[in-house]
Amino acid sequence: MNPGRPVPPPLAKTISLDTAGSEPSTGVLAAAYGATSPMSGLVPLTVARREPGEDDVEIAIEFCGLCHSDVHATRGEWRQPPYPLVPGHEIVGSVTRVGSAVEDFAVGDRVGVGCMVDSCRECDSCLEGLEQYCERGNVGTYGAADPRHEDAVTQGGYSTAVVVDKRFVLRVPGNLDPAAAAPLLCAGITTYSPLRYFDVEEGDSVGVVGLGGLGHMAVKLAKAMGAEVTVFTTSESKFDAARELGADHVVLSKDADAMEAANRSIDVIIDTVAAPHDLNPYFRTLRLDGALFQLGLPADDMPPVSPGLLIRRRLAYAGSLIGGIEETQEMLDFCAEHGVASDVEIVGAGQLNEAYDRMVAGDVKYRFVLDTATLQEPSERADA
């Protein structure tokens, strides 16, 4: 446990999301866990989901992955969010109701919802299937104003039910374990998208910086694409774990000689580290026309990159943000075909605050997943 984390209020206290800006109260009441302030920790809540419209899919949530961004969001570390806030954007469950205009989903289907639940649907990015880069801003799965529903604040997947527009619902293949599939909707697509953008295939060499929730998925996906994979880590204790995941090589990145030995050996690097670190040694491991994709989002500035390194080898330095809906479905189908899933530890609602502390401490292999069956029943309040 992190002794610096504020002590939350008693978990027996249930708070209803009946404040201005919460979702309309005409639909199902869902039990949930969320934060009521930066200092509250996660506590039981009751959230009122909207009544499904003609394009909506109502989902009984079975599992929801815990993402490190959930910690930042609920604790107000990136910005002051609208409280109460129910996090969770790695949702897997079963369809319970569909709107009259929904044809692709039926009651009982296993489905998923990722990091966004809507976009403008009209800009060039949206029309190209890149909703994550919507020029007007996509609607996040939690903590975002939903302009198509009276600017109601979206509430996430640490709950028993959710209602989502059909365009942002994904089909989860039946041969994927539902708990292990949940993190694919964030960690999976976040690493799959840059690998696909670079057209990684058999014979390519992929470097993965960091071996956490994102890094372990990058290793698995790159191997499934036929690549030779090198893991860069600052910790010798992760060597065996990297090899167990399928890495062909493991390099201790703080060892200058080991990094020099890897010079010009990599085609593309997936950097998952969210703390400031010097990228120049990694650029030196890239071959001509190589690329480094930055996925981690450090809170502080990174050391400067040497332009000469980029120029002399025609290297690219790029970022990447999750993936569009079509590509996310492609990723799920790819994982089902190749037997790829996240390594997960399932937790109950009463373990969520401890799980957050363990995430901050890096004490998880490799993703936590909430079993929503452990959430308490919602309060019987028509106005919640």
Model regions and ranges:
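Glycine-rich beta-strand-centered segment in the early N-terminal region that forms part
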Residues: 50-64, 77-127, 132, 155, ...
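NAD(P)H dinucleotide-binding glycine-rich loop of Rossmann-like/cofactor-binding domains
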Residues: 120-209
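Glycine-rich phosphate-binding loop and adjacent beta-alpha segment
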Residues: 276-349, 372-384
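Conserved beta-strand positions in the Rossmann-like core of class I SAM-dependent methyltransferases
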Residues: 96, 230, 293
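Short N-terminal strand-loop motif that marks the start
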Residues: 1-92, 156, 160-164, 372-384
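Adenosine-nucleotide cofactor-binding segment
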Residues: 202-211, 216, 221-281
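C-terminal hydrophobic helical "lid"/dimerization subdomain
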Residues: 2-5, 11-28, 236, 325-384
